[in-house]
């Protein structure tokens, strides 16, 4: 039987798991503790996500081979992470449809949350919606794109 776990590691609060812009060859499942993901633009750090036990992160770089979109760090002392490398990830996606569906569901959930935040921020700034935002709303309301 194939071993799915590259390794389990424990992190201290504030310890960097991966840095924004670095290549991604693994994803992580939070066994215990918490992780935060941030991005830094023009010297300003912005919180993208805070996650806890049972959640996963780092999968985007495995799916699209792009560099990491944010910096992940432990948000609690004793945060334990299970690391899956690219080979194990691809094996699970191919052999375990439920795993692939979980990844897709979570990605869709995250996209919808970001879309909602974008539209909320756009409304607060008094700006007009872009055509892409109009299409997103139409799609969510069952309209044709």
Predicted regions and their residues:
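A short beta-strand-loop-beta hairpin characteristic of the jelly-roll/cupin
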Residues: 35-48
């Amino acid at each position: 039987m194939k071993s799915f776990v590259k390794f389990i590691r424990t992190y201290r609060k504030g310890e960097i798991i991966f840095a924004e812009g670095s290549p991604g060859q693994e994803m992580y499942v939070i066994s215990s503790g918490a992780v935060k993901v941030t991005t830094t633009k023009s010297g300003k750090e912005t919180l993208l996500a805070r996650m806890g036990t049972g959640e996963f992160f780092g999968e985007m770089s495995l799916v699209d081979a792009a560099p990491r979109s944010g910096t992940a760090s432990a948000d609690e002392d004793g945060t334990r992470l299970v690391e899956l490398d690219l080979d194990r990830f691809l094996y699970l996606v191919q052999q375990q449809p439920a795993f692939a569906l979980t990844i897709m569901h979570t990605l869709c959930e995250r996209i919808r949350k970001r879309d909602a935040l974008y539209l909320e921020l756009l409304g607060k700034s008094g700006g007009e919606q872009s055509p892409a935002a109009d299409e997103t709303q139409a799609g969510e309301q069952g309209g044709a794109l």
